[in-house]
Amino acid sequence: KKVLVLEQHYVPGGFTHTFRRKGYEWDVGVHAVGEVTTHTLPGRILHSLTKGTLEWASLGEHYEEMYYPDDFKIQFPSHPKVFRQTLLTAFPDEEKAIDAYFELIRNVSKSMRSYYLSRIMPKWTRPISDSLLAGKAQNYLEQRTSDVIQSLTSNERLQHIFVAQWGYYGSLPK
């Protein structure tokens, strides 16, 4: 097999360098910011912090597409309900796994909010705040992504789609 790698930067790969502008530094992973609408907590926080001076460009109805060698293509819609329907259309026999995946995402997201809240508490409160706020998240954080995804479905293509965007997070799902 041959693989073509298209890379314009002098250092190939992601997470290999940072940008610096006007005293600020960030890694290349921040090329898109999601959930910045007025209907989401991150969007409301950023709107408040910037006093409404930032205008966010939409990533579009589908912010990503994946193409497979056998002509299978899947789009990643911006809205979770549309993504669920996209997955159900592509994998009609996997409704249980798809619903379990979305339920898991909701639960992990909710537990991470509590986890981060526990991280901003004074250190002397950690024994209490960790047990009250961080416990569920810690359970998720101690699991390998690949193990969790494999527990949802044996369909390898669906497993790949569930973890397709691992590159955004800088670590392999295993």
Where are these regions (language model features)?
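N-terminal glycine-rich phosphate/pyrophosphate-binding loop and immediately adjacent elements
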Residues: 1-110
